[in-house]
């Protein structure tokens, strides 16, 4: 089974935000992949100028079968440009990968499995 890449915002880099609950959910979601025997990598970025380059580098690390884009990037209206750029980066650097969207970090495995079918 091809590896999966999870792309999201680094909760510890969001000003005025308590990262603990999201970090716990990310860890729980990662454990679900491990328990399912699926190779998974995580790319968490800050909302800054380096985000796109970091994501592009992560996308080129392996031939990912699925890339899951987290809600932190996808949902806020003020991040729509970043979301569009992430989709373009996936298409450019991992054209073989299916694109999936989770509802929260714990559902990332479910999202990836929907696209693995």
Describe each region flagged by the PLM.
Residues 1-15:
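N-terminal, charge-rich interaction modules
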Residues 28-39:
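Short helix-loop-beta junction
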Residues 11-13, 46, 72-76:
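Short histidine/acidic/glycine/proline-rich micro-motifs that form metal-
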Residues 82-117:
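Ser/Thr/Gly-rich flexible loops in soluble cytosolic domains mediating phosphotransfer, phosphorylation
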Residues 55-91:
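Mid-chain, well-packed structural core segment of small domains
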Residues 52-57, 112-115:
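Distinct, well-ordered alpha-helical segments
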Residues 41-50, 101-104:
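Short beta->alpha junction loops
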Residues 13-25:
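Glycine- and acidic-residue-enriched helix-capping/strand-helix junction motifs
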């Amino acid at each position: 089974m091809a590896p999966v890449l999870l792309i999201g915002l680094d909760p510890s880099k969001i000003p005025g935000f308590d990262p603990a609950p999201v970090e716990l959910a990310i860890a729980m979601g990662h454990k679900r992949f491990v328990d399912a025997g699926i190779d998974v990598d995580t790319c968490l970025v800050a909302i800054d100028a380096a985000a796109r380059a970091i994501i592009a580098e992560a996308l080129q690390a392996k031939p990912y079968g699925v890339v899951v884009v987290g809600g932190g990037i996808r949902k806020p209206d003020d991040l729509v440009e970043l979301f569009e750029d992430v989709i373009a980066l996936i298409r450019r650097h991992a054209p073989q990968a299916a694109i999936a969207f989770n509802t929260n970090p714990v559902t990332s495995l479910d999202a990836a499995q929907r696209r693995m079918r």
